[in-house]
Amino acid sequence: LRRQRQMCIRDRECMEERQVTADGVTYPLEEPFFVIATQNPVEMQGTFPLPEAQLDRFLLCLSLGYPEKEQELALLSRPAAVPESKPVATAAQLLAARQELAQVTVSAAVQEYLVELAHASREHRGIQLGLSTRGMLSLLEVSRAAAAMHGRTYVTPDDIKWIAADCMAHRMTARGSMWEENQETCRSIAEELLQTVPVPKESLWN
């Protein structure tokens, strides 16, 4: 347990502060740096749930599901050799894209909508632990990315709705829910909140 605790502390440090401390010496991590983790939704024996503070540092939680039929057919027909992976962007291009996203504007009305979503998650009777302030800030950042992907320089409520469940569900804890069921329950509640929290008028954010 002590070793697991030390690993969690170190993981939180690298994910939040972009540095690692070992034997009292701090090492900055090269940018861009990010962590990708996988989780098997079926086999959970022998694993332990991550603490809430560490889950909160993951920007998104995505479920890939099964491939489409056409994709599986393509897998069967490809050569047995492992396909060669080629980079699609350089580190410099990723950093430049990050700087461009910072220029995407968020109106006061949309900011207030984000705050209302966060507070609604904390006040929902089915939620024990709602969206944190860090989670709300993360939702703001991914909404900027969604706006850019949709070809706009400003965030709309639709951008938030498009990505919110993927950003919120893993950060919340449902009341009386087993570990295996928690994320599915929280995703359903997040989608419910997106339908019930009032959206600002278009004239306030456009």
Regions found by a protein language model. Give the residues of each.
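Conserved AAA+ ATPase small/helical "lid" subdomain
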Residues: 86-139
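Conserved RecA-like P-loop NTPase ATPase core
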Residues: 10-11, 38, 58, 114, ...
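C-terminal engagement/docking regions of AAA+ P-loop ATPases
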Residues: 123-206
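Signal for well-folded cores of large energy- and translation-related assemblies
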Residues: 12-16, 43-46, 63, 77, ...
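Short, small-residue-biased leader/transition segments that mark boundaries at the very start
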Residues: 2-9
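An amphipathic alpha-helix signature
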Residues: 69, 73-77, 111, 115, ...
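Canonical AAA+ ATPase core
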Residues: 15-89, 95-104, 144-149
